[in-house]
Amino acid sequence: MNKEKLLYENSKHALQSDNIIAITNRHLCSRPFMEQLERVCKLHPHAIVLREKDMPEAEYLSLARDVIALCKKYDVQCMLHSFINVAMELEHPYIHLPLPILEAYVKKNVSGNISTGMSKSTDNYQQFFKVIGTSVHSVEDAIKAEQLGATYMTAGHIFATDCKKGLPPRGLDFLKNVCDAVEIPVYAIGGINIASNDNSTASDSPSTYDAMPDISVPRLAEVMECGAAGGCIMSGMMRV
């Protein structure tokens, strides 16, 4: 992972691919969900994590099929979230699993490492997943995740965020400790917002026009200075 890449490449609204992961939450969108995701794809983040884990599995399967196709159109990686059976059904070897789910599935793997793969049976691992993300909240979590075969992780929450009201952020020292403890890419999550050219954050209110705004990610430099590969954005991406 080249952590020296710049966030921008010629355009203020072309996010450098290695730096930003977009996290979805359809409940935050003012536009139709697929329309909003197309706007996100036009920013060319490193990946979009389809984190609609409150959906029934059949509904998620249908949505995932459409989102994977949309992401392919824009050459953006789509990471499915939690629904491991959906990933297998769609033969889509890119998934983000909460750490307890990752650990549970690894226990079914005789070799003890999910990245050695799975066939279409969740009990039979045979070279299936190419990218496995997980979420960590301590250095111990991070070390465990790497041992379990995660290929990247999100760590947080780093800054104060409405998504975690009442919970103090873990801060930049925590992020640096996580980054120092593992070899795989770490993406900071929590309180990382998009700033538009009028100095407001995209998470404050949805854009009221169809044109893509000029944007920046003010806190990205801070997290990358701690050794992170980049940052994750939910609210801002669902309202850009």
Indicate where each model-derived feature is located.
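N-terminal amphipathic alpha-helix/helix-capping segment at the start of soluble metabolic enzymes
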Residues: 1-35, 111
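Active-site mouth loops of central-metabolism enzymes
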Residues: 17-32, 131-135, 192-197, 209-215
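Conserved, mostly hydrophobic/aromatic
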Residues: 22, 48, 87, 145, ...
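N-terminal active-site wall of soluble small-molecule enzyme domains
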Residues: 47-111, 124
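Alpha-helix-loop-beta-strand connector modules within alpha/beta enzyme cores
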Residues: 63-79, 108-109, 125-137, 168-191
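Catalytic cores of alpha/beta
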Residues: 78-93, 137-148, 184-188, 192-200, ...
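Glycine/Thr-rich beta-alpha phosphate-binding loop at enzyme active sites
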Residues: 90, 94-99, 104, 133-180, ...
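Glycine-rich phosphate-binding active-site loops on the catalytic face of alpha/beta enzymes
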Residues: 99-106, 154-166, 194, 213-240
